């Protein structure tokens, strides 16, 4: 009976780690919880793309479609799905939800599950090295709501929201170090694969962080054991078996196309050291003041990728852990992971608050010597031709950072938003802060041994207060949401003869909304998902559409199989833009107005 009581008590802690994030998440996205099948977090941004991905995977499973080719967008050319992350760790795992309840419900379920599972992963990991359940629970909640996680919630990017596999992988490695059983290494390999299948960024993150963590955590005695290398190979085989089939189409796409980013462009998505100490501008108490008075916060208005605030209490706790914890191998391992996150998030070049590379003037003679030596030409493809020429003409040099060494490598060079590495810093600092709290509790118990019960009670209270303060530092106002439902015009299109659809005005928002609308009306689209690597046909077709009502442009549009053109009077679209497209269609003899459906006007191209 006593054993059963302990077992039930232990299960309660696991349930708390999984369930407590939900009431904390509710204030951030109340509309999503209330309208679960029709609303998704964030404005109409990349979130719609990943709702489409959830739908597409369901269609692949239900109808046997090609996972990496969609013939119904950019019709009749089709869309190479390798232009976007398929995030199989979400789209495949939640495919049953998609098939039963639709892609919006599946997307929302994946988002909410990421907070619950990140909390649970942190709970397991921290409990593995502290053996304190309340402390592990507090670390789990803090780890689930770090600024990186909530910032991407506001941005709607599902691959980056999916952070849970990182702490779960580190937990499996930690358990292997302690138990030295091959099963934990196999589990680590599987979880590593799920990281890659959630986001290719996560693959790169853990390719750097996991070996560093394990090598410093395990120490030489374990690394010298023959059995370890056999176990490690098992883990690698499992990871490769999961990742390689999904990665091959992307690797082939990288060979066909140049998907590398210039360092000057990557700098726009990098941060400088001050950003790690800059609170978020969406905090309910001091956010407005930070936005107005902190120069390092100005870019947060347009770029949530710069929200990398480490948290003052978390940093303080991590410093205590580094100094006081007796688990020196663990502190070194966590410190290394945090350092990888910080250094990599700063990108290949030192940047100012706006993401502009910091340059220093040098004598003209030095510039000429570097030019004669061919060094400027050597870095032209890396920095970008225009930026290199600017440096040459102004006789200035950039300040390279350690990540510049990695940014030359093939896969690393295709990573644009390097500030995403900050998730490693967040999770490692949370682990170090837990070690700091553990060290303080141990010291208190040693000093006041006679008052053990009182020390335990005070320690529990201190952990709860510290967790609340850390969460409050990271807190933000509710996230904007987007309603996705069948519009009257979609109902009309669903009952029309087959023909491709174009939705105007041109722009990312309208184009994304049209992608979801296609799931409702089922007609093909002449345009489609934008993505980080838009297919060449996207730019070509947009250029043709800009020439309407030119007769040659109309003929070109007809060759795409277009029969329906919509003008969406979406909030935020300027009156002059709407007038421009109205005039274009009214002056097209081939176009006939079919009707107005709420705020959307529909035209039929009879002349094609």
Give the location of each predicted region:
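Membrane-lumen/periplasm interface segments of specific transmembrane helices
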Residues: 199, 233-265, 273-274, 279-289
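Signature aromatic-anchored transmembrane alpha helix within multi-pass, membrane-resident enzymes
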Residues: 211, 232-240, 339, 431, ...
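Hydrophobic alpha-helical membrane-interfacial segments at the cytosolic entry of transmembrane helices
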Residues: 13-23, 190-191, 223-248, 263-268, ...
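Membrane-interface coil-to-helix junctions
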Residues: 21-118, 146-151, 157-163, 270, ...
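Extracytoplasmic
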Residues: 181, 262, 323, 465-608
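Membrane-interface helix-loop-helix junctions at transmembrane boundaries of multi-pass membrane enzymes
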Residues: 10, 220-233, 318-373, 378-400, ...
